[in-house]
Amino acid sequence: MNKIAIYPGTFDPITNGHVDLVERALNIFDEIVVAVSTAYGKNTLFDIRIREQMIKEVFKDNQRVKVVSFQGLLVDTAVKHNACAIVRGLRAVSDFDYEFQMSSVNNKLNSDIQTIFLTPSEKFSCISSTLVRAVAIHNYKRVDEFVPECVFREIKLKYSKE
């Protein structure tokens, strides 16, 4: 039986830090389901179809990574995809409070699904989608080192029109 984990997020956009986390999680699990959230209540840079498409392109050569979109409860999506764990990244202590609360709620909703926290590789510890969006607003050309090439192309398309 394959050990499957789900890695949820808005991924607006996916960063090299997210990619690193997926690659490292594959050392623990047989398959990672990257679950792209509809981002209820958030204004996103990219709509969900584009975010999902970019992530599929990033992992197109990795048969062990599946990309899906979802809305609703994460634990329901995890069950749907036979995941035994939720993978979450912790960049800083400030992430812990929120992630701990979410982990506790998910555990109450389905105690069979565990939450696994991974810290980023040092070179990715300061990268976030929020940072990428903030830099891109001022100078999209400066975000190329923070995101995969296909994501940079989408950012360039979006901001070179403005």
Swiss-Prot record:
Q: What does this protein do?
A: Reversibly transfers an adenylyl group from ATP to 4'-phosphopantetheine, yielding dephospho-CoA (dPCoA) and pyrophosphate.
Entry's Gene Ontology molecular function annotations: ATP binding; pantetheine-phosphate adenylyltransferase activity
Query: A GO BP term, please?
Result: coenzyme A biosynthetic process
EC number(s) given by UniProt: 2.7.7.3
Q: Which residues does the annotation say bind substrate?
A: 10, 42, 74, 88
Upper classification of the organism: Bacteria, Pseudomonadati, Pseudomonadota, Gammaproteobacteria, Thiotrichales
Site-annotated residues for Transition state stabilizer: 18
Going by the UniProt record, its keywords in alphabetical order are:
ATP-binding, Coenzyme A biosynthesis, Cytoplasm, Magnesium, Nucleotide-binding, Nucleotidyltransferase, Transferase
The pathway entry for this protein reads as: Cofactor biosynthesis; coenzyme A biosynthesis; CoA from (R)-pantothenate: step 4/5
Tell me which HAMAP family the record gives.
PPAT_bact (MF_00151)
- Protein name, UniProt field: Phosphopantetheine adenylyltransferase
CDD domains, alphabetized: PPAT (cd02163)
Q: State the needed cofactors, names only.
A: Mg(2+)
* Residues involved in ATP binding: 10-11, 18, 89-91, 99, 124-130
Query: What NCBIfam families does its record include?
Result: coaD_prev_kdtB, cyt_tran_rel
Show the PANTHER family listed in the entry. PHOSPHOPANTETHEINE ADENYLYLTRANSFERASE
**Subunit structure, as described in the record:** Homohexamer.
Q: Which domain of life is it from?
A: Bacteria
Report the enzyme's class at the first EC level: transferase
Q: Show the catalytic activity.
A: (R)-4'-phosphopantetheine + ATP + H(+) = 3'-dephospho-CoA + diphosphate
Record's family?
A: Belongs to the bacterial CoaD family.
Q: Name one Pfam family in it.
A: CTP_transf_like
GO cellular component labels: cytoplasm
Source organism:
Francisella tularensis subsp. mediasiatica (strain FSC147)
Q: Which InterPro entries match?
A: Cyt_trans-like, PPAT, Rossmann-like_a/b/a_fold
Q: Where in the cell is it found?
A: Cytoplasm
